[in-house]
Each structure stands twice: as C-alpha cells, then as structure tokens.
UniProtKB/Swiss-Prot annotation:
Protein name stated in the entry: Enterotoxin type B
Listed Pfam families: Stap_Strp_tox_C, Stap_Strp_toxin
Protein source organism: Staphylococcus aureus
Subunit composition and interactions: Interacts with MHC class II molecules composed of alpha/HLA-DRA and beta/HLA-DRB1 chains. Interacts with T-cell receptor beta variable 19/TRBV19.
GO cellular component, as recorded: extracellular region
Subcellular location: Secreted
Disulphide connectivity of cysteines: 120-140
Keyword terms: Disulfide bond, Enterotoxin, Metal-binding, Secreted, Signal, Superantigen, Toxin, Virulence
Domain of life: Bacteria
Family statement drawn from the similarity comment of this UniProt entry: Belongs to the staphylococcal/streptococcal toxin family.
Signal peptide span: 1-27
Length: 266
C-alpha cells in the first residue's frame, strides 16, 4: 500500500513539473485589474509618440523563416528584411527562457510583433554580416513567434474586439488572422493599430484616455495588458515590450477581445 502511495506521489510530482516547465504558453487566468493597478496617462510626462510608434504601420512580419544565429541562450536571430523603410535585415527575438528559444530553434516559423531599436544588442557574429552598417541594420522584439507548419488557416478568421469607454460598449470591430494558434502580441498589435488610427489612442504628446487595458478571454481564462506607459518623463520601449516575452498564445477560434478605456475628466 505504501509503495503504491509513494509511486502515486512520484507520478504526481513529475506531472506538475511537466506542466510548469512546458514551453507552450497558452492563456492563463488573471484577475481583472483594479483601478489603482492601471497606469494613468496623466502621470506620464514624456512623449506618447514613443508608445505610438510601436503600434503604427511599421512592425516585424515574416512567414516561414528559420533562425540563423543565437546571441544568448534565450533568444533567436532571424534574417528578416524591413521591406517598407529598409531599417533592418536581421531581427533578434528574445524569449522569457531557454525552453521557449529551444522550442523554435531550427524550425520554420512565422514572426509578427512590435519592435524596438534603442538598447537592441546582437552578437558580433551577426553584426559582421552587415559589416559597416551594423547599427542601422538590426532590430529587436520579444516573442511573436508561431510554428508555420500545421498552423495555417485556409482563409482569414475574424475576431471581434469590443471597446468599452467609461463602462459603455461604444465600438466593436474585427481583427483578422490566418493562424490557428496566434500570439496575444499579434492580436494586441492589430487592436491598438486600429485604435490609434480611428480613436487616437496615442497622440504625439499624450492620450485622450486616462487608463486603458486590453483583455483576452479564452473559455474560462483571461489575461490583460496595460495600454498606458508607466509614470515618469521617459518611456522605455524595450522594458514595455518585455510583457510579450512569454510568447503567450490563444486559439483564434475561441478567443474574445475586450478593451476598457476611461476618458480624462475635463
């Protein structure tokens, strides 16, 4: 009897370890934020333009690519060219841990996400690829990677975004993806891109909204990202985008998206 009990405990421990260590990060439950948990745009005195550019027309996007190098054990480097502005031809993708990097190393993947340049570091080996233009030919991002094979839809799938302004559902619109499993980062980018264009979510100096967060709901689980910068006079793009480093994914057929905004009091 004791032997069977011991074996059962061992099996349970290994099962828990497997769950904790698995690199496939899907939606996990997170309580809705309390008002005092959210950043307030009125407390940010820097340029909101530095947030806006993360969700404007320029982002990293590549289909069916494979990593060419690795700087640190938790990142991968891809040969991806900026076809719009010509600002980079190599992209460093940083993950939360080694397991995630190993999961996608040497596999064909799709990459989509917001990128930054300041404090973007590459290995000397990758820098040498670009010789004298090293500082101008690279960019960095966090997560945003999905396996290419077996993850494509025959046609784009629409996901409805419901926008609540001061508690009222004043707007709904669709974002689209052709992926079965899609990163929250990709859907977040598409949502904010729409709101920047149509609701002036971020302007040059500030925002017409005091607080905002985007919420992803999948079955009974939900999680959210704060849409405003932290208090202060400077905005660190790298630090802000780090929230995507777990490469969190959702199922495009099940996920629901809600945005909660509060306007500034006049």
């Amino acid at each position: 009897m004791y032997k069977r009990l011991f074996i059962s405990h061992v099996i349970l421990i290994f099962a828990l370890i497997l769950v904790i260590s698995t690199p496939n990060v899907l939606a996990e439950s997170q309580p809705d934020p309390k008002p005092d948990e959210l950043h307030k745009s009125s407390k940010f005195t820097g340029l909101m333009e530095n947030m806006k550019v993360l969700y404007d027309d320029n982002h990293v996007s590549a289909i069916n690519v494979k990593s060419i190098d690795q700087f640190l054990y938790f990142d991968l480097i891809y040969s991806i060219k900026d076809t719009k502005l010509g600002n980079y031809d190599n992209v460093r993708v940083e993950f939360k841990n080694k397991d995630l990097a190993d999961k996608y190393k040497d596999k064909y993947v799709d990459v989509f996400g917001a990128n930054y340049y300041y404090q973007c570091y590459f290995s000397k080996k990758t820098n040498d690829i670009n010789s004298h233009q090293t500082d101008k030919r690279k960019t960095c991002m966090y997560g945003g990677v999905t396996e290419h094979n077996g993850n494509q839809l025959d046609k784009y799938r629409s996901i409805t975004v419901r926008v609540f302004e001061d508690g009222k559902n004043l707007l709904s619109f669709d974002v689209q993806t052709n992926k079965k499993k899609v990163t929250a980062q990709e859907l977040d980018y598409l949502t904010r891109h729409y709101l920047v264009k149509n609701k002036k979510l971020y302007e040059f100096n500030n925002s017409p909204y005091e607080t905002g967060y985007i919420k992803f709901i999948e079955n009974e689980n939900s999680f959210w990202y704060d849409m405003m910068p932290a208090p202060g006079d400077k905005f660190d793009q790298s630090k802000y985008l780090m929230m995507y480093n777990d490469n969190k994914m959702v199922d495009s057929k099940d996920v629901k998206i809600e945005v909660y905004l509060t306007t500034k009091k006049k």
